[in-house]
């Protein structure tokens, strides 16, 4: 049964659409998919609007995006829904991580909001974690969704010029640099997105090297 399940989800298409309008995410996912030797497109290539993400989990929102783009493009679609959760803030912003940056995607403002909020917490532990859910959907409705998580500490002030989003204020456990200070290639090997993609590779892209 397990072997049959795995065969049903092996990616054999010649094109794939990244269901995202976030240039940082598109760049990271495109790099991960590069060894596939397939045409990698993105939602902007089809002038698709962003669907309403009303899921209560990262996995639900990832599925909403991949299903929407796959259905409207007629091509298999890979989506990412990710965010950061601060233990001192009851795991906020979580699935609302992008919304905290506002319509203008001002993550400097969002990071300042995080810092201001944590300052008000008595005896903060500064623990936080990034979560990434990846969802691969086909036009026929078939789908598979996986997730990855990396734990770390909140760091202030923001440091680093690489990465995007909340990377400048997150230091993964076992390291002394923020995600934004790490070379992108190294960050891609240890991030929440990398962990989720490793799971997806084993199920859908077995030809890719680990």
Residue ranges and their predicted role:
Residues 1-5:
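Short, Lys/Arg-enriched N-terminal segments with co-localized hydrophobic residues
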Residues 7-17, 23-208:
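Anionic-ligand binding patches
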């Amino acid at each position: 049964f397990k072997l049959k399940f795995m065969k049903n989800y092996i990616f054999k298409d010649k094109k794939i659409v990244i269901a995202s309008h976030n240039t940082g995410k598109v760049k990271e996912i495109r790099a991960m998919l590069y060894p596939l030797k397939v045409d990698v497109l993105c939602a902007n290539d089809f002038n698709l609007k962003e669907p309403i993400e009303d899921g209560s989990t990262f996995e639900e929102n990832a599925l909403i995006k991949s299903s929407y783009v796959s259905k409207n493009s007629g091509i298999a679609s890979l989506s990412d829904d990710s965010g950061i959760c601060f233990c001192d803030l009851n795991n906020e912003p979580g699935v609302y991580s992008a919304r905290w940056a506002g319509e203008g995607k001002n993550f400097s403002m969002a990071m300042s909001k995080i810092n201001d909020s944590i300052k008000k917490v008595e005896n903060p532990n500064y623990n936080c974690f990034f979560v990434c859910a990846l969802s691969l959907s086909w036009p026929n409705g078939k789908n598979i969704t996986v997730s990855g998580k990396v734990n770390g500490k909140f760091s202030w002030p923001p440091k680093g010029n690489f990465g995007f989003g909340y990377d400048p204020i997150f230091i993964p456990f076992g390291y002394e640099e923020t995600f934004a200070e790490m070379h992108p290639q190294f960050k891609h090997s240890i991030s929440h997105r990398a962990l989720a993609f490793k799971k997806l590779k084993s199920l859908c892209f077995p030809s890719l090297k680990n």
